[in-house]
Regions:
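RecA-like P-loop NTPase motor core of helicase/translocase proteins
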Residues: 1-166
Length: 166
């Protein structure tokens, strides 16, 4: 599934905007770290241990990976490609621990949250179908993804105020 998606992103005759090279390379980096590096013995282990150490020092309960993209480079498209890669592999390889169908996307505000709705498979402007990010025969697999898009305010403690009667 991964190889097929990579071929699609590189070689498909897109009717509209094709993924930029930097978008494909960002996704390839995440794929390499997840699928290739663990199989490279000590060479891959070195990269993974470095990331594990940095994550443990920063926040031992949350593993993070950052992909650097310039302003306007299409981070939403990259998110859609990453979700597609993970969800399709999770559906087609249900016993694998490398892949997931569950995604939590935290936006910085309501405007961005609304723009990210294109990451929902059932949205009328879904990037998976409208931007042809997923081969048509794989689109039903994306429907199995569980995606929650919220904004960071949802995690703030709610304040209660007592208003005295009077």
């Amino acid at each position: 599934e991964t190889a097929r998606l990579l071929q699609h992103w590189r070689n498909h005759a897109f009717s509209g905007i094709r993924p930029f090279f930097c978008q494909v390379e960002a996704v390839e980096t995440a794929i390499w770290l997840t699928e290739v590096a663990p199989q490279l013995g000590n060479n891959g282990k070195r990269f993974l241990e470095h990331l594990d150490k940095a994550n443990t020092e920063a926040n031992p309960e949350l593993s993070r990976l950052a992909l650097k993209l310039a302003t306007g480079a299409g981070k939403t498209t990259v998110m859609a490609m990453l979700i597609a890669w993970q969800a399709i592999n999770a559906v087609r390889r249900p016993n694998s621990q490398k892949f997931t169908r569950g995604f939590l996307i935290v936006a910085p505000g309501l405007t961005i949250k609304d723009r990210l709705r294109v990451l929902m498979p059932n949205d009328t402007e879904s990037y998976y179908a409208n931007r042809e990010l997923v081969p048509s025969d794989m689109l039903p697999d994306i429907a199995h993804a569980r995606i929650v898009i919220t904004n960071y305010h949802a995690f703030r403690l709610r304040e209660r105020m007592d208003i005295s009667k009077g």
